[in-house]
Amino acid sequence: MKFASLTLTAAVSTCFVSVQGFSPAASFSARASSALQSTVEAPQERVAPGAGWEPEWEGREGKSPDEFLNSDMSRPDLSGMWECPLTRWDSEGIDVVKAQREAKKMPHCPLELKASPAMNAQGIDYFSKNKKKIRADLLKYGAIWLRGFDLMQDVNGFRDMHEALGLDPCLDPLHSSGLRKFASERDALYEEVNKPSLRGHYIGLHCESTAKRTAAYAAFVCFQRATEGGGRFIVADGAAILAEMDTKVLQKLYDRKIRISVSNLDIPPALPGFIKEGIKGAVDKAVAPKFDMDLEMIYESDGKPGRLQAVETAESPINRHPVTGLPVWFNNAHNHARKLRDRRPCGVPEVGMTEVFYADTMEPLSLEDCAEIKRASEKHITALPMEPGDVLLVDNYRALHGRDVFNGDRFHAVSWFTWDDNEEWRGEERRILEKNGLNKAINSMMDWLPKDFESNQS
């Protein structure tokens, strides 16, 4: 749910234009330990978080865009893919202390699977022959870094790989996202957040999930690394974060639950109440449903007079994995908490800023709780130096992902997958074509942003 905020805001603005497993390669980066300070003080220096592990780059070359995006038109068209499945919630009655003990037993995430010359020589056959083990390892480790494979350096080889593994593509949970256009629609491949206007925006850890819909798996592929540096892909184990977090903070968050606001619309506070309620009702009925999220429109939940926020329903920050039953940290607070976003590189305008609240009082998370989420999360980040052909397979109910800032041009892409072995969990919905027009319209709007757009929301 990384950019529900911008996409919802873009749609709102069209309606109300006149309103305003490998060895650690480096120790935990010092930049991650910068202290959080009070939000009422002067704006803080923006510092990109660090990581617990930072493997070295290898300097592998890839293909040109004309080559890596050249789809094989003789293959079946996958554009009528499955709808993203509904979120599998199983969060009641979790013993937090016991859950932390269980989580500590999990192996390091991600597992690195590095291609040898012999493995590369097999091409697609390697994945066909090793399908069972790779799928089992994905469940065990939460993510697998397929490193140095020649096969996945273009869209056709990438598709060969995930089809050999038996993965079944589905839509992004927020298909109407203005920052999620297709790289190759007929291959069910979305472009990742490569837009020049957002290269200076740090994307925090999150699952590709809303309270309503969650993809079961993902495969992130690098076709072109950032030409002028940066752009590491970050991943962390939800089990490791759960085990790491202070037990009292974790229990507090679990007991109180959280709610996430995904958009701000600032209405002049002096407007009469009936006008403000009319705006609220219009947004609720005409715009929010297009995003296939369960949202409530609430005024001034963050204390700002006149601010209308679109807020998701209450959700538990801990959820049991649908297949293994393992309780894991399953929420997007590291990405969406305002107190964290205000202190790192952020390319989101004020209207698109998110916030995380305690569900029982609708108060923003405290500075202390945000600091603990930051510490526990960033200690377990692996910042991957993904190069052409590299793929990160992700169990979306176990591992969280994000992206560091970068310079120059970069091209990563992603395919999302539904439950291929459980028809009930997958559901019977196919692609909702009505979403596509909104998707394209908002993409066009987002392309208007300057290449180095930077927010000034602090």
Regions found by a protein language model. Name each.
Residues 43-141, 148-387, 400-424, 429-457:
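Non-heme Fe(II) oxygenase catalytic core, chiefly the N-lobe of the double-stranded beta-helix
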Residues 2-27:
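N-terminal chloroplast transit peptides
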Residues 21-22, 26-41, 45:
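N-terminal mitochondrial targeting presequences
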